[in-house]
UniProtKB/Swiss-Prot annotation:
The gene is TMK. This is Thymidylate kinase. Pathway: Pyrimidine metabolism; dTTP biosynthesis. It is an enzyme of class 2 (transferase). It comes from Cowpox virus (strain Brighton Red). PANTHER family: THYMIDYLATE KINASE. The lineage of its organism: Viruses, Varidnaviria, Bamfordvirae, Nucleocytoviricota, Pokkesviricetes. ATP binds at G11, L12, D13, K14, S15, G16, K17, T18.
Protein backbone atom coordinates (compact mmCIF):
# COMPACT_ATOMS: atom_id res chain seq x y z
CA UNK A 1 0.00 0.00 0.00
CA UNK A 2 1.38 3.40 -0.98
CA UNK A 3 1.49 6.03 1.72
CA UNK A 4 -0.51 9.21 1.78
CA UNK A 5 0.85 12.63 0.90
CA UNK A 6 1.33 15.46 3.38
CA UNK A 7 0.17 18.60 1.60
CA UNK A 8 0.36 21.92 3.44
CA UNK A 9 -1.26 25.25 2.60
CA UNK A 10 0.60 28.35 3.77
CA UNK A 11 0.19 32.08 3.30
CA UNK A 12 -0.58 35.30 5.12
CA UNK A 13 -3.76 35.77 7.12
CA UNK A 14 -6.84 35.95 4.89
CA UNK A 15 -4.93 34.65 1.84
CA UNK A 16 -7.56 31.97 1.25
CA UNK A 17 -5.88 28.92 2.76
CA UNK A 18 -8.97 27.49 4.42
CA UNK A 19 -11.09 28.18 1.33
CA UNK A 20 -8.66 26.31 -0.91
CA UNK A 21 -8.39 23.43 1.56
CA UNK A 22 -12.17 23.10 1.56
CA UNK A 23 -12.20 23.27 -2.24
CA UNK A 24 -9.85 20.29 -2.32
CA UNK A 25 -11.96 18.32 0.14
CA UNK A 26 -15.05 18.96 -2.00
CA UNK A 27 -13.50 18.48 -5.44
CA UNK A 28 -11.55 15.31 -4.62
CA UNK A 29 -14.05 13.37 -2.50
CA UNK A 30 -12.30 10.35 -1.02
CA UNK A 31 -12.13 8.43 2.23
CA UNK A 32 -8.34 8.55 1.90
CA UNK A 33 -8.10 12.35 2.20
CA UNK A 34 -8.48 14.21 5.49
CA UNK A 35 -8.29 17.85 6.55
CA UNK A 36 -6.27 19.16 9.48
CA UNK A 37 -5.68 22.74 10.55
CA UNK A 38 -3.30 24.46 12.95
CA UNK A 39 -3.47 25.67 15.56
CA UNK A 40 -5.81 22.99 16.88
CA UNK A 41 -7.64 25.13 19.40
CA UNK A 42 -9.43 22.24 21.16
CA UNK A 43 -6.32 20.95 22.97
CA UNK A 44 -4.81 22.38 26.15
CA UNK A 45 -2.14 24.24 24.20
CA UNK A 46 -4.70 25.20 21.59
CA UNK A 47 -6.93 26.86 24.17
CA UNK A 48 -3.97 28.84 25.48
CA UNK A 49 -3.15 29.89 21.92
CA UNK A 50 -6.75 30.93 21.33
CA UNK A 51 -6.72 33.08 24.46
CA UNK A 52 -3.54 34.74 23.21
CA UNK A 53 -4.76 35.29 19.65
CA UNK A 54 -8.06 36.76 20.81
CA UNK A 55 -6.21 39.04 23.27
CA UNK A 56 -7.72 37.45 26.38
CA UNK A 57 -4.27 36.66 27.76
CA UNK A 58 -0.73 37.82 27.13
CA UNK A 59 2.45 35.73 27.05
CA UNK A 60 5.99 36.63 26.14
CA UNK A 61 7.04 35.82 22.59
CA UNK A 62 9.16 32.81 23.54
CA UNK A 63 6.24 31.14 25.31
CA UNK A 64 3.97 31.88 22.35
CA UNK A 65 6.42 30.29 19.91
CA UNK A 66 6.72 27.19 22.07
CA UNK A 67 2.94 26.90 22.45
CA UNK A 68 2.40 26.91 18.69
CA UNK A 69 5.21 24.40 18.25
CA UNK A 70 3.88 22.12 21.00
CA UNK A 71 0.44 22.25 19.40
CA UNK A 72 1.90 20.78 16.20
CA UNK A 73 3.94 18.17 18.06
CA UNK A 74 0.76 16.97 19.76
CA UNK A 75 -0.35 15.74 16.33
CA UNK A 76 3.00 14.49 14.98
CA UNK A 77 2.28 10.82 15.71
CA UNK A 78 -1.24 11.13 14.30
CA UNK A 79 0.10 12.66 11.08
CA UNK A 80 2.77 9.96 10.74
CA UNK A 81 0.26 7.16 11.32
CA UNK A 82 -2.28 8.56 8.88
CA UNK A 83 0.30 8.93 6.11
CA UNK A 84 1.60 5.40 6.65
CA UNK A 85 -1.97 4.09 6.44
CA UNK A 86 -2.37 5.66 2.99
CA UNK A 87 -4.30 8.73 4.11
CA UNK A 88 -3.45 12.02 2.42
CA UNK A 89 -3.60 15.01 4.77
CA UNK A 90 -4.54 18.49 3.60
CA UNK A 91 -3.10 20.76 6.28
CA UNK A 92 -4.06 24.40 6.82
CA UNK A 93 -0.86 25.96 8.26
CA UNK A 94 2.10 24.00 9.61
CA UNK A 95 5.60 24.56 10.95
CA UNK A 96 6.37 27.20 8.31
CA UNK A 97 3.75 29.49 9.83
CA UNK A 98 5.34 29.07 13.23
CA UNK A 99 8.80 29.93 11.96
CA UNK A 100 7.66 32.85 9.78
CA UNK A 101 5.62 34.48 12.54
CA UNK A 102 8.30 33.91 15.19
CA UNK A 103 11.03 35.34 12.97
CA UNK A 104 8.83 38.32 12.10
CA UNK A 105 8.71 39.09 15.82
CA UNK A 106 12.50 39.01 16.03
CA UNK A 107 13.21 35.40 16.99
CA UNK A 108 16.08 33.50 15.41
CA UNK A 109 14.86 31.57 12.37
CA UNK A 110 17.47 28.88 13.02
CA UNK A 111 16.31 28.43 16.61
CA UNK A 112 12.63 28.48 15.60
CA UNK A 113 13.25 25.79 12.98
CA UNK A 114 15.07 23.64 15.52
CA UNK A 115 11.89 23.42 17.61
CA UNK A 116 10.06 21.98 14.59
CA UNK A 117 12.91 19.70 13.50
CA UNK A 118 11.73 16.10 13.19
CA UNK A 119 8.07 16.76 12.46
CA UNK A 120 6.71 14.82 9.46
CA UNK A 121 8.04 16.54 6.35
CA UNK A 122 5.48 17.80 3.82
CA UNK A 123 5.60 16.41 0.30
CA UNK A 124 4.26 19.71 -0.99
CA UNK A 125 3.72 23.19 0.42
CA UNK A 126 1.30 25.38 -1.51
CA UNK A 127 1.92 29.05 -0.77
CA UNK A 128 -0.97 31.36 -1.60
CA UNK A 129 0.22 34.82 -2.53
CA UNK A 130 -1.83 37.74 -1.23
CA UNK A 131 -2.78 40.64 -3.47
CA UNK A 132 -3.02 44.18 -2.13
CA UNK A 133 -6.72 43.69 -1.42
CA UNK A 134 -6.08 40.64 0.75
CA UNK A 135 -3.17 42.27 2.56
CA UNK A 136 -5.21 45.38 3.31
CA UNK A 137 -7.95 43.17 4.77
CA UNK A 138 -5.50 42.11 7.47
CA UNK A 139 -6.98 44.36 10.11
CA UNK A 140 -9.05 42.43 12.59
CA UNK A 141 -9.63 41.36 16.15
CA UNK A 142 -6.85 38.77 16.39
CA UNK A 143 -3.41 39.88 17.47
CA UNK A 144 -1.54 39.20 14.20
CA UNK A 145 -4.13 40.84 11.94
CA UNK A 146 -2.03 43.90 11.21
CA UNK A 147 -0.85 44.97 7.74
CA UNK A 148 2.69 45.99 8.72
CA UNK A 149 3.27 42.80 10.68
CA UNK A 150 1.93 40.63 7.86
CA UNK A 151 4.48 42.23 5.51
CA UNK A 152 7.25 41.16 7.89
CA UNK A 153 5.82 37.64 7.93
CA UNK A 154 5.87 37.59 4.13
CA UNK A 155 9.59 38.38 4.08
CA UNK A 156 10.28 35.45 6.40
CA UNK A 157 8.24 33.10 4.21
CA UNK A 158 10.30 34.23 1.21
CA UNK A 159 13.52 33.31 3.02
CA UNK A 160 12.26 29.77 3.61
CA UNK A 161 11.05 29.40 0.03
CA UNK A 162 14.45 30.48 -1.27
CA UNK A 163 16.22 27.82 0.80
CA UNK A 164 14.91 25.20 -1.62
CA UNK A 165 14.92 22.24 0.79
CA UNK A 166 11.13 21.90 0.64
CA UNK A 167 8.91 21.48 -2.42
CA UNK A 168 7.04 24.79 -2.55
CA UNK A 169 4.41 25.67 -5.15
CA UNK A 170 3.58 29.38 -5.26
CA UNK A 171 0.08 30.32 -6.42
CA UNK A 172 -0.24 33.85 -7.77
CA UNK A 173 -2.91 36.14 -6.41
CA UNK A 174 -3.55 37.31 -9.98
CA UNK A 175 -5.46 34.16 -10.94
CA UNK A 176 -9.24 34.28 -11.08
CA UNK A 177 -10.79 32.15 -8.35
CA UNK A 178 -12.07 29.41 -10.66
CA UNK A 179 -8.69 29.18 -12.40
CA UNK A 180 -6.89 29.09 -9.05
CA UNK A 181 -9.20 26.37 -7.75
CA UNK A 182 -8.62 24.13 -10.79
CA UNK A 183 -4.86 24.74 -10.80
CA UNK A 184 -4.52 23.84 -7.13
CA UNK A 185 -6.67 20.73 -7.56
CA UNK A 186 -4.43 19.48 -10.37
CA UNK A 187 -1.27 20.19 -8.36
CA UNK A 188 -2.67 18.28 -5.37
CA UNK A 189 -3.75 15.31 -7.49
CA UNK A 190 -0.28 15.09 -9.02
CA UNK A 191 1.34 15.22 -5.57
CA UNK A 192 -0.90 12.41 -4.32
CA UNK A 193 -0.14 10.21 -7.33
CA UNK A 194 3.63 10.77 -7.31
CA UNK A 195 4.43 10.46 -3.59
CA UNK A 196 7.14 7.86 -2.97
CA UNK A 197 9.36 6.59 -0.20
CA UNK A 198 8.95 6.84 3.56
CA UNK A 199 7.71 9.94 5.34
CA UNK A 200 10.59 12.38 5.73
CA UNK A 201 11.57 14.40 8.77
CA UNK A 202 11.40 18.16 8.56
CA UNK A 203 14.64 20.14 8.84
CA UNK A 204 16.77 17.14 9.80
Amino acid sequence: MSRGALIVFEGLDKSGKTTQCMNIMESIPSNTIKYLNFPQRSTVTGKMIDDYLTRKKTYNDHIVNLLFCANRWEFASFIQEQLEQGITLIVDRYAFSGVAYAAAKGASMTLSKSYESGLPKPDLVIFLESGSKEINRNVGEEIYEDVAFQQKVLQEYKKMIEEGDIHWQIISSEFEEDVKKELIKNIVIEAIHTVTGPVGQLWM
